């Protein structure tokens, strides 16, 4: 990897999307409503070859706040809230059964949160059974994954997940340094995570992911490298190493973080440079902008073939799926639309009580949106772009259609961060760290001064 010129690199740090969707969630609007979603369901059900389904269920509850977290969560310790939520999930599932063909093949199944394992094993089993009764056609090679908080994970949880066919677990680790954990209000010793991982391995879980975050308060390069040494002892198959997005104007809990303890941009870049070098020496290959996988892992093999895809859950080898979002604040996607459920429980429940799908907002994509989405997702996933693939799919002359955008990439080429070739362009290893910046050049919605986004570095 090129050595980072920190002074020059700092100029690229500006607010920008992470492109888990395009158009991004800030473009979702209330013009996309329940009827819009029902129409989208009908259109997709009646395609000649309907896409497989990906089911995402949001389980929003947490016992206490982790100050770094930007997820949609509800803090509670009340058992009755969980019981009530399950009853409303069942109402939503019944409405989905009437609104779409739920007998289509299911290729992916994911529990996110919140803390999914804050629900008891019996409750998790009840939720899973309810979903499987409505969506019964699980593929033989289905990916079933669940986010795990090691502080709320028991053998009984693992037994339930195993019995229901889960084969992928993602552990929220963040950092093993106690001073960092204290600053972000999430104490979980190495031994706790070690015990959870051993439990998963004992049950034959073959795909284990760790979520790590750099840029947290009290972090240093030396401290984070020590965390990575501990990580290697647990031998995860994949790592997601996120740049901490400090957006206290969006997430109030982040205001509890002492900003004087946050590492500087230069410190963050040093951490990033060192972690990439460390992980690659340990045989973890960089995937896209923030994931790592062992060289024999399916993610890396898909990257070699330029077949990776990116969605709200990260990177996947599944080419195209229609995501059905279930639960409060969950997001669904169908290639030509996005939909999001109500973000607060009151409106979510009220819609269901009235017999309506709890759609708060979304967006129907124009043909131009679909084209730009494909370009941006190819860049975000594979760090390169083959013009011919876009031209064949959309019947466009890429260089003519994106003449202005390609001109805007020239400075990256001059800086040695990207190279053009006869087929298209490819980012260098260091340039891949700026993939968000480069993707922004193809975003037709950016208006400048995007303060609602986190910084790209």
Swiss-Prot record:
The record lists S-adenosyl-L-methionine 1 as bound by: 56, 113, 147, 331
What is the predominant subcellular site recorded for this chain? cytoplasm
Spell out the InterPro entries in the cross-references. Answer: Coprogen_oxidase_HemN, Coproporphyrinogen-III_oxidase, Elp3/MiaA/NifB-like_rSAM, HemN_C, rSAM, rSAM_horseshoe
The entry sums up its family as follows: Belongs to the anaerobic coproporphyrinogen-III oxidase family.
Q: Which organism is it from?
A: Helicobacter pylori (strain ATCC 700392 / 26695)
Which SUPFAM superfamilies does this one have? Answer: Radical SAM enzymes (SSF102114)
Compartments where found: Cytoplasm
* Name of the gene this protein is made from: hemN
Q: Identify the residues that bind [4Fe-4S] cluster.
A: 62, 66, 69
Q: Report the GO molecular function annotations.
A: 4 iron, 4 sulfur cluster binding; coproporphyrinogen dehydrogenase activity; coproporphyrinogen oxidase activity; metal ion binding
User: What name appears for this protein in its UniProt entry?
Assistant: Oxygen-independent coproporphyrinogen III oxidase
Kindly list the positions annotated as binding S-adenosyl-L-methionine 2.
Answer: 68, 114-115, 174, 186, 211, 245
